[in-house]
Swiss-Prot record:
Gene: minC
Keyword field: Cell cycle, Cell division, Septation
Family indicated by similarity: Belongs to the MinC family.
Keyword Methyltransferase listed: no
PANTHER family the UniProt entry points to: SEPTUM SITE-DETERMINING PROTEIN MINC (PTHR34108:SF1)
HAMAP family linked: MinC
One Gene Ontology biological process: division septum assembly
Matches recorded under Pfam families: MinC_C
Subunit details: Interacts with MinD and FtsZ.
Domain of life the protein comes from: Bacteria
Purpose: Cell division inhibitor that blocks the formation of polar Z ring septums. Rapidly oscillates between the poles of the cell to destabilize FtsZ filaments that have formed before they mature into polar Z rings. Prevents FtsZ polymerization.
Protein name, per record: Probable septum site-determining protein MinC
Species this chain originates from: Rhizobium rhizogenes (strain K84 / ATCC BAA-868) (Agrobacterium radiobacter)
Length: 241
């Protein structure tokens, strides 16, 4: 029996884009996972609830290695929503969807890093390390709900960081505007990292895993141009002249 659909309402299908964290692992995966664990330990809840895309572009791996990596990430509560740059031969049933055409967030001007792997005709084939970028500059304000994550070095924001936004840097953070959101410098263990901002109204600041919440900051520093640094296990702050 044929069922006739008489409901005049149509099914609405829309396309939307969402901000996702891109993880670009390096070989060997064991060493990369150690560095990831260190980041997660110093930034509690860092990956909790975040959409994550796994970029395996140009990595000489097979399906079993990819499945093992996804399983390791799952044990760390890192949920992979998609895989970019994977050869069709290494994908299989039960894996996250293959993605292509991804690009850096259009709101930001982030230097692109192309992975380089050189295969030599020698008994042991060793992939070269991906090129390291030491700093990035974001030339627009960072809006609520957005995240800038750059574990390789310093982050400079030519603008303000809204409440609910966050900056995570392996090095120092420079904000030429108001810091209302969260700023986490030295995320991979760089205790010498600093945070600089033109106007301090932060929800949270952290250096090398040491946190200070808004209510813990001296009242005389609120709304001021400030630099923050780590001294022992305490975050110190002073006004900028």
């Amino acid at each position: 029996m044929t069922k006739v659909i008489t409901d005049p309402r149509s099914i609405r299908i829309k396309g939307r884009s969402f901000l996702a964290v891109m993880l670009s692992p390096d070989l060997p995966f064991d060493n990369w996972l150690i560095r990831l664990d260190d980041l997660a330990a110093r930034s509690a809840g860092f990956f909790l609830g975040r959409p994550v895309v796994l970029d395996v572009t140009d990595l000489p791996i097979d399906r079993s290695q990819l499945k093992e990596l996804i399983a390791e990430l799952g044990q760390r509560n890192v949920s992979i929503m998609g895989i970019e740059g994977a050869r069709p031969s290494i994908l299989g049933p039960g894996m996250p969807a293959a993605l292509k055409g991804g690009r850096a967030v259009s709101d930001f001007e982030v230097p692109e890093k192309e992975p380089t792997i050189e295969l030599r005709s020698q008994p042991a084939t060793v992939p070269e390390a991906r090129p390291s970028v030491q700093s990035i500059t974001i030339r627009e304000p960072v809006r609520s709900g957005q995240s800038v994550i750059f574990p390789e070095g310093d982050v400079t924001v030519v603008g303000s960081v809204a409440s609910g936004a966050e900056i995570v840097a392996g090095g120092s953070i420079h904000i030429y505007g108001t810091l209302r959101g969260r700023a986490m410098a030295g995320s991979l263990g760089k205790a010498s990292a600093h945070i600089f901002c033109r106007k301090l109204e932060a929800e949270l600041v952290a250096i090398d895993g040491i946190y200070k919440m808004a209510e813990d900051m001296p009242a005389n520093l609120r709304g001021q141009a400030v630099q923050l640094w780590l001294e022992g296990d305490a975050i110190k702050a002073e006004k900028l002249i």
